[in-house]
Amino acid sequence: MMAARLLGTSSRIFKLNKHLHTSKVAFMPVVQFKLSDIGEGIAEVQVKEWYVKEGDTISQFDKVCEVQSDKAAVTISCRYDGIVKKLYHEVDGMARVGQALIDVEIEGNVEEPEQPKKEAASSSPEAPKSSAPKAPESAHSEGKVLATPAVRRIAIENKIKLAEVRGTGKDGRVLKEDVLKFLGQVPADHTSGSTNIRTTHQAPQPSSKSYEPLKEDVAVPIRGYTRAMVKTMTEALKIPHFGYNDEINVDSLVKYRAELKEFAKERHIKLSYMPFFIKAASLALLEYPSLNSTTDEKMENVIHKASHNICLAMDTPGGLVVPNIKNCEQRSIFEIAQELNRLLEAGKKQQIKREDLIDGTFSLSNIGNIGGTYASPVVFPPQVAIGAIGKIEKLPRFDKHDNVIPVNIMKVSWCADHRVVDGATMARFSNRWKFYLEHPSAMLAQLK
């Protein structure tokens, strides 16, 4: 009898366990938040800083971590509400696109709806947005709407039917961002798991001691901008370089800038010499478009670029970075100065945006800010030409009467890809650039 009872009890327990194991878990699931595609062919990034730790409560749009790609510092924001259960990488570790950054335990049911609806493909263009939000076609007319309690609470507080909100999460899940978009509180170009260039971190302040002697050898990982420089310069070694040097009398430019400096100050514009160098280069490129070019990967074509996106080799706390000022041929000297100042400020804070680093067509490097006269700049592939500008020096020169007079002299060093640029073209371009700097008022004649 006792054995029979035990067998009966065991059978009931087995059936109960079987029933429990076949039930779907409908609460507190753990999801992986993965590193989304940053773009520009970037496959991996370095984790510079975590803004969360295991056990922290996190919400949608909260910052998760800051990563450093070869081109820019990027802040990764979350797309879930929940609790951080696991961090997958250490600080300074490398994370690959598509791999998990963190595990998040989220509230709500993640099981698929019993009768998922297949959305019909629409060929009609999206209607323009009006001031009052218009309900999109329901994506949840059949089955259960997937959303966390936090999202449902926002919907209830704003008297919104979640069935009218198109979910962009997995399996049509409605995210907080979707509800806020529906309310018109979030710009349309904001995306979950967005990668925003950081805006809060400042460049590290220098300590009172300018250096600290090393007591032993230190291995420094090649990361961030330096890693990008390694790749670029390795490619540049494949280019046969042609060099050309010259000097420019910038007496007139010094006076011209002094006249405009106060006028620029009234407009809150810091006016250095660099905007003049950039504008003069752009005007000269109009006459020699073969220098405002890029080559294709197979070296079968040289693409003459319509836009003058002039790159500036910039020294930053994170290493060398080469952003560019777009459409210099359409900008005035003051407009170029404003854009230059923006890039310089962003470089100091390591906040250079990705769009500022792409599509460059020609490069200038102002080594004169640090010192030096001549240099041997390296072409920035796939571009075909670069110039290095030395410091302005007061040097003795002969006037037309053979008298020795003091003259403001600036030296320039050009380098070009000798596979596609001949020496004569580089020399003629340099002469035209030199003419505009020695006669700065001539630049005004070119303005439209």
From Swiss-Prot:
The branched-chain alpha-keto dehydrogenase complex catalyzes the overall conversion of alpha-keto acids to acyl-CoA and CO(2). It contains multiple copies of three enzymatic components: branched-chain alpha-keto acid decarboxylase (E1), lipoamide acyltransferase (E2) and lipoamide dehydrogenase (E3). Within this complex, the catalytic function of this enzyme is to accept, and to transfer to coenzyme A, acyl groups that are generated by the branched-chain alpha-keto acid decarboxylase component. One of its GO terms (molecular function) is acetyltransferase activity. This is Lipoamide acyltransferase component of branched-chain alpha-keto acid dehydrogenase complex, mitochondrial. It is found in: Mitochondrion matrix; Cytoplasm, Cytosol; Cell projection, Dendrite; Cell projection, Cilium. Signal peptide: none annotated. Residues 191-210 have a biased composition (Polar residues). Residues 108-146, 191-211 are annotated as: Disordered. It comes from Caenorhabditis elegans. GO terms for biological process: fatty acid biosynthetic process; positive regulation of egg-laying behavior; positive regulation of embryonic development; positive regulation of fatty acid biosynthetic process; positive regulation of nematode larval development. The modification N6-lipoyllysine is found at residue 71. Binds 1 lipoyl cofactor covalently. Its EC number is 2.3.1.168. CoA binds at residues 257, 272, 315, 365-366, 390, 392. It comes from the Eukaryota. GO terms for cellular component: cilium; cytoplasm; cytosol; dendrite; mitochondrial matrix; mitochondrion; neuron projection. Ubiquitously expressed. It catalyses: N(6)-[(R)-dihydrolipoyl]-L-lysyl-[protein] + 2-methylpropanoyl-CoA = N(6)-[(R)-S(8)-2-methylpropanoyldihydrolipoyl]-L-lysyl-[protein] + CoA. InterPro entries: 2-oxoA_DH_lipoyl-BS (IPR003016), 2-oxoacid_DH_actylTfrase (IPR001078), 2-oxoacid_DH_E2_comp (IPR050743), Biotin_lipoyl (IPR000089), CAT-like_dom_sf (IPR023213), E3-bd_dom_sf (IPR036625), PSBD (IPR004167), Single_hybrid_motif (IPR011053). Disruption phenotype: RNAi-mediated knockdown results in reduced monomethyl branched-chain fatty acid generation and also results in larval arrest in the subsequent generation. Residues 121-136 have a biased composition (Low complexity). It is an enzyme of class 2 (transferase). Keywords: Acyltransferase, Cell projection, Cytoplasm, Fatty acid biosynthesis, Fatty acid metabolism, Lipid biosynthesis, Lipid metabolism, Lipoyl, Mitochondrion, Transferase, Transit peptide. Its cofactor is (R)-lipoate.
